[in-house]
């Protein structure tokens, strides 16, 4: 369970922002969304494989030299 201590004279907005940032760092929302519905193991493997391919091509594209514009 994630908790934050609200400091004295701290606005609610700031405390809420700190809480959201903590939740984001822990990855709780992404984990919760992933577990919201059952995903078959084959579908999960397929999704992860597609994400890995996408990351690979993105890395390759970033390493290429830019085309010269004449």
UniProtKB/Swiss-Prot annotation:
UniProt keyword Ribonucleoprotein present? yes
The UniProt keywords, alphabetically, are: Ribonucleoprotein, Ribosomal protein
Listed under GO biological process in this entry are: translation
The terms under GO molecular function for this entry are: structural constituent of ribosome
Per the record, the domain of life is Bacteria
Q: Name one GO cellular component term.
A: ribosome
Q: Is the keyword Ligase in the record?
A: no
Q: Which residues form a coiled coil?
A: none
Transmembrane feature ranges: none
Q: What HAMAP family has UniProt attached to this entry?
A: Ribosomal_bS21
Q: Which family does it belong to?
A: Belongs to the bacterial ribosomal protein bS21 family.
Q: Which NCBIfam families match?
A: S21p
Protein name (database record): Small ribosomal subunit protein bS21
Organism per entry = Verminephrobacter eiseniae (strain EF01-2)
């Amino acid at each position: 369970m994630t908790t934050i201590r609200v400091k004295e004279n701290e606005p609610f907005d700031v405390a809420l922002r700190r809480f959201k940032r903590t939740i984001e760092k822990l990855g709780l929302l992404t984990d919760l969304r992933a577990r919201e519905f059952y995903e078959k193991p084959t579908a999960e493997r397929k999704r992860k494989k597609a994400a890995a391919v996408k990351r690979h091509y993105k890395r390759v594209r970033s390493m290429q030299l830019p085309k010269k514009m004449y």
